[in-house]
């Protein structure tokens, strides 16, 4: 089926490399960065500016600024056949025409979020322990994330359940896509894959790389080699 007419939920099935990036306001290179990362094989790209260097320097993104940044990411995602994700905000996801809305444990109830964004976009959920993971398997989210695998500066103060949660999730063999998240980089990726994950979310492994395209290519190759 042509990718242009595939639904996001169908494209999600093939996705294995999920990138969260801030708006890179202090660098002013969001378009170039996104193009490089997506050219390297990133399947989903999410804007998450909370706690970023740009937020510290310029303050929180206002809704209009967030939509402008998402427009840049959406353009790159279209050109590379990737999925665009919005974090937390169903209204922003709707306004941006996003493919994906990602919800945390304390965000909108699933049915409310679905009522806002409609049926086409996929919805994901963060999980941080075995109980939350079990709920995510049963509830009507399209995918979920498990972690953090390691403590991460993007989630300060959050305990890391570690690879045990990845192993437990793999043992459940969920009938929907799931991603390991939290502190994953090229060096740690083999441990994550050995624990049973075949999809990962990364941040600094690509956002802090001197060559984002090469970093994405290396991560994608390792995931693909794991089968």
Curated annotation (Swiss-Prot):
Entry binding sites for 2-[(2R,5Z)-2-carboxy-4-methylthiazol-5(2H)-ylidene]ethyl phosphate: 152-154, 183
Biological process terms in GO annotation: thiamine biosynthetic process; thiamine diphosphate biosynthetic process
Residues where 4-amino-2-methyl-5-(diphosphooxymethyl)pyrimidine binds: 46-50, 87, 126, 155
Protein name: Thiamine-phosphate synthase
Aminoacyl-tRNA synthetase recorded as keyword: no
PANTHER family: THIAMINE-PHOSPHATE PYROPHOSPHORYLASE, THIAMINE-PHOSPHATE SYNTHASE
Cofactor comment text: Binds 1 Mg(2+) ion per subunit.
Enzyme class, spelled out: transferase
Gene that produces this protein: thiE
The family this protein is said to belong to: Belongs to the thiamine-phosphate synthase family.
A GO CC annotation given for this chain: cytoplasm
Stretches that traverse the bilayer: none
Cited CDD domains: TMP_TenI (cd00564)
Keyword Metal-binding on entry: yes
Record-listed Mg(2+) binding positions: 88, 107
E.C. numbers: 2.5.1.3
Cofactor: Mg(2+)
This protein's pathway: Cofactor biosynthesis; thiamine diphosphate biosynthesis; thiamine phosphate from 4-amino-2-methyl-5-diphosphomethylpyrimidine and 4-methyl-5-(2-phosphoethyl)-thiazole: step 1/1
């Amino acid at each position: 089926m042509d990718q242009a007419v595939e639904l996001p939920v169908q494209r999600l099935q093939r996705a294995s490399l999920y990138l969260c990036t801030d708006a890179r306001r202090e660098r002013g290179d969001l378009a170039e960065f996104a193009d490089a990362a997506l050219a390297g094989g990133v399947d989903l790209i999410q804007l998450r500016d909370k706690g970023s260097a740009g937020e510290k320097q310029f303050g929180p993104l206002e809704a209009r600024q967030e939509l402008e940044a998402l427009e840049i990411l959406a353009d790159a995602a279209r050109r590379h056949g990737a999925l665009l994700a919005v974090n937390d905000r169903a209204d922003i996801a709707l306004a941006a025409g996003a493919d994906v809305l990602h919800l945390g444990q304390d965000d909108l109830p699933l049915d409310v979020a679905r009522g806002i964004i409609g049926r086409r976009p996929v919805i994901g959920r963060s999980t941080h322990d075995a109980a939350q993971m079990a709920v995510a398997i049963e509830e009507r989210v399209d995918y979920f994330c498990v972690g953090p695998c390691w403590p991460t500066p993007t989630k300060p103060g959050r305990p890391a359940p570690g690879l045990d949660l990845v192993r437990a999730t793999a043992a459940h063999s969920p009938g929907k896509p799931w991603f390991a998240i939290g502190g994953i980089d090229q060096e740690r990726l083999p441990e994550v894959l050995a624990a049973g994950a075949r999809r990962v979310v990364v941040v600094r492994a690509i956002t802090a790389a001197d060559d984002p395209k090469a970093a994405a290519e290396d991560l994608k190759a390792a995931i693909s080699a794991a089968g």
